[in-house]
UniProtKB/Swiss-Prot annotation:
It is found in: Cytoplasm. It catalyses: a 2'-deoxyribonucleoside 5'-diphosphate + ATP = a 2'-deoxyribonucleoside 5'-triphosphate + ADP; a ribonucleoside 5'-diphosphate + ATP = a ribonucleoside 5'-triphosphate + ADP. It comes from the Bacteria. SUPFAM superfamilies: Nucleoside diphosphate kinase, NDK. InterPro entries: NDK-like_dom (IPR034907), NDK-like_dom_sf (IPR036850), Nucleoside_diP_kinase (IPR001564), Nucleoside_diP_kinase_AS (IPR023005). One of its GO terms (biological process) is CTP biosynthetic process. PROSITE patterns: NDPK (PS00469), NDPK_LIKE (PS51374). This is Nucleoside diphosphate kinase. Belongs to the NDK family. ATP binds at residues 11, 59, 87, 93, 104, 114. The gene is ndk. SMART domains: NDK.
């Protein structure tokens, strides 16, 4: 099995609204393996680096303020096709456009409070994982049911 990894963050609104267990459960039920997990209140510097691609956008300041306003649950998930699958589990950025059954479609209402962040590609995933986690914070392990998750 290809050991692709992605970065997922439950934003302060998702933590405050009590969705941590439900969101983790959706990824586990899908068959992905959690290899990194921590809860923290991000510094402004971390938030600015994370969302640096939006630095020139008018909403950048509000986004940084929001992400650093409360606890975030930062995670690294591993599995075959995890980046694309995670994006599908999460749903569209705008909750009103997100399909029912997705995390945002079921739980979010407002684009500025859309519960969760997920890496949008391999390069982004690597950047975000390296930004939020040190190598020693990531756990290499095998699930007892790994042979039942994939043919490879």
């Amino acid at each position: 099995m290809t050991k692709e990894r992605t970065f997922i963050a439950i934003k302060p609104d998702g933590v405050q609204r009590g969705y941590v267990a439900e969101i983790i459960g959706r990824f586990e039920k899908k068959g992905f393996k959690l290899v990194g997990l921590k809860q923290l209140i991000p510094s402004k510097d971390l938030a600015q680096n994370h969302y640096g691609v939006h630095r020139e956008r008018p909403f950048f300041g509000d986004l940084v303020d929001f992400i650093s306003s409360g606890p975030v649950v930062a995670m690294v998930w591993e599995g075959e096709g995890v980046i694309l699958s995670a994006r599908k589990l999460i749903g569209a950025t705008k909750p009103l456009e997100a399909e029912p059954g997705t995390i945002r479609g079921d739980l979010a209402i407002d684009i500025g409070r859309n519960i969760i962040h997920g890496s949008d590609g391999e390069d982004t995933a690597k950047f975000e994982i390296d930004l939020w986690f040190n190598e020693e914070e990531l756990c290499e392990w095998e699930t007892s049911d790994a042979k039942w998750r994939s043919e490879n």
